[in-house]
């Protein structure tokens, strides 16, 4: 066995997906693995690099398609991918990297603000050795939150924002608002 595998962390906004991605990549760095992280280049909310909502920063390559960074990552054995739902080639890329013996760690939204599957991220589930569904805290009633609620009236799927544009909510608060 080549040791390659896929770890997938999914959940709503503000559930700690990016923080967990950074934690996992750091574990491998401590064990002397060569690690790289990749972020979606259109996500420039806080500046360059991978940022968490609580303003922790982590160095990252930027791309809109993962195939664009293939040549840059050949020497790395651990690949972290943030905002995986935005990459159109996420499934093919992760499968290829894992089959080549690389450890691939993906953080992604599983659902849109409309509670629909987010692009093809759910197609990674049957290919992943580990899947973790994280929850947030409902920003209305403070119960467990599994959904992301958009505050504005925009209808496009890809609108990148923070707590100025989205809330994490539980089922009841999603339906009630």
Curated annotation (Swiss-Prot):
What enzyme category does the UniProt record give?
A: transferase
The positions making up the signal sequence are none
User: Record's Pfam families?
Assistant: TK (PF00265)
Q: Enumerate the GO terms in the molecular function aspect.
A: ATP binding; metal ion binding; thymidine kinase activity
The UniProt annotation places ATP binding at 11-18
Q: Where is the active site?
A: 83 (proton acceptor)
Detail which positions bind substrate: 113, 157-161
* Record-linked SUPFAM superfamilies: Glucocorticoid receptor-like (DNA-binding domain), P-loop containing nucleoside triphosphate hydrolases
The family database entries (Gene3D superfamilies) matched by this protein are listed as:
3.30.60.20, P-loop containing nucleotide triphosphate hydrolases
Q: Which UniProt keywords apply?
A: ATP-binding, Disulfide bond, DNA synthesis, Kinase, Metal-binding, Nucleotide-binding, Transferase, Zinc
Its recorded reaction(s) are: thymidine + ATP = dTMP + ADP + H(+)
One biological process term from GO is:
thymidine metabolic process
What biological function has been recorded for the protein in this entry? Phosphorylates thymidine and thymidine analogs, such as azidothymidine (AZT). Part of the salvage pathway for pyrimidine deoxyribonucleotide synthesis.
- The protein's name is Thymidine kinase
Q: Which organism is it from?
A: Vaccinia virus (strain Tian Tan)
Cite the source lineage.
Viruses, Varidnaviria, Bamfordvirae, Nucleocytoviricota, Pokkesviricetes
The gene name on file is OPG101
